[in-house]
Amino acid sequence: MSELEKAMVALIDVFHQYSGREGDKHKLKKSELKELINNELSHFLEEIKEQEVVDKVMETLDEDGDGECDFQEFMAFVSMVTTACHEFFEHE
């Protein structure tokens, strides 16, 4: 398996490690998203302690307005964070 394919499998695995703990196994609730960000993105994003921050992140991601983050919305978030990190490291 190529490095890119391994990365894709890892993204899918991480999403499903957190989704469905509290409901729909194909979506992240706010608490699941917060835990995922704090555990899996701690080197790129500061730990989220304030509920208002989680609410704002979810509001931005939740394109269909169902109050949860599906895989497509999660991938849009990962893409935004990855792009921001790429731009940061490119200028170092």
From Swiss-Prot:
SMART domains, per database record: EFh, S_100
Positions of Ca(2+) 2 binding: D62, D64, D66, E68, E73
Expression across tissues: Although predominant among the water-soluble brain proteins, S100 is also found in a variety of other tissues.
Alphabetical list of Pfam families matching this protein: EF-hand_1, S_100
Residues annotated as binding Zn(2+): H16, H26, H86, H91
Domain EF-hand: 13-48, 49-84
Residues given in the record as Ca(2+) 1 binding sites: S19, E22, K27, E32
Induction note: Up-regulated in periinfarct ventricular myocardium.
Record GO biological process: adaptive thermogenesis; astrocyte differentiation; cell adhesion; cellular response to hypoxia; learning or memory; long-term synaptic potentiation; memory; negative regulation of skeletal muscle cell differentiation
Residues annotated with N-acetylserine modification: S2
A GO cellular component annotation in the UniProt record: ciliary basal body
Record localization: Cytoplasm; Nucleus; Secreted
Keywords of this entry: Acetylation, Calcium, Cell adhesion, Cytoplasm, Metal-binding, Nucleus, Repeat, Secreted, Zinc
Keyword Cell membrane: no
Outcome of swapping C85A: Decreased zinc-binding
GO molecular function, one term: signaling receptor binding
Assembly description: Dimer of either two alpha chains, or two beta chains, or one alpha and one beta chain. The S100B dimer binds two molecules of STK38. Interacts with CACYBP in a calcium-dependent manner. Interacts with ATAD3A; this interaction probably occurs in the cytosol prior to ATAD3A mitochondrial targeting. Interacts with S100A6. The S100B dimer interacts with two molecules of CAPZA1. Interacts with AGER. Interacts with PPP5C (via TPR repeats); the interaction is calcium-dependent and modulates PPP5C activity. Interacts with TPPP; this interaction inhibits TPPP dimerization.
Function description: Small zinc- and- and calcium-binding protein that is highly expressed in astrocytes and constitutes one of the most abundant soluble proteins in brain. Weakly binds calcium but binds zinc very tightly-distinct binding sites with different affinities exist for both ions on each monomer. Physiological concentrations of potassium ion antagonize the binding of both divalent cations, especially affecting high-affinity calcium-binding sites. Acts as a neurotrophic factor that promotes astrocytosis and axonal proliferation.
Protein name from the UniProt record: Protein S100-B
UniProt organism field: Rattus norvegicus
